[in-house]
Amino acid sequence: ISYPHPLLKNGLVVLDTPGLNALGTEPELTLSMIPNAHALLFLLAIDTGVTKFDLEVWQKYVQPGATRRVAVLNKIDLMWDDLKTPAEIERDVARQISETSALLDLPRSHVAAISAQQALVARVRGHDALLARSGIAQLEHLLASEIIPAKQEIMRAAVKREIGSMVEASRLALTS
């Protein structure tokens, strides 16, 4: 997919792997990518929040394997109920963000609530109000302010990790 976005022009590369629950008994592709990812966006649906399965995956693979973690609560448009006031909707979204932050032991600033579908519709149609309501700007800001600038640090840690294991293997070979 080619999309002209400033984050992509600044070096952000996105690899979308299948969700673990969609993989059945062969999750190796997704799991093998976690330790090498510069950042991991853990996509959840806002209407279900963090399920028991999500929490198990988070605790077993994401927390120990990913250095930079962001939880993304997608589909906030499902909460846009015409019978609720904007303040009530905002309060419900904020509650779900707080719960997700607590469950995943993430700073609240690393939990974004978005509607990816509405963000795309807004971008295609040039609808600024819908784009703002989609919440995508918060996620883009998080990526732009923390992930892209940290790319050099992330790459340095990855090289150190790779070279460190090679040096250790060489040291063991020499010792034996």
Show where each model-derived region lies:
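Globular "head" domains of long coiled-coil molecular machines
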Residues: 1-155
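Extended, charged coiled-coil helical stalks used as long, distance-spanning scaffolds
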Residues: 158-176
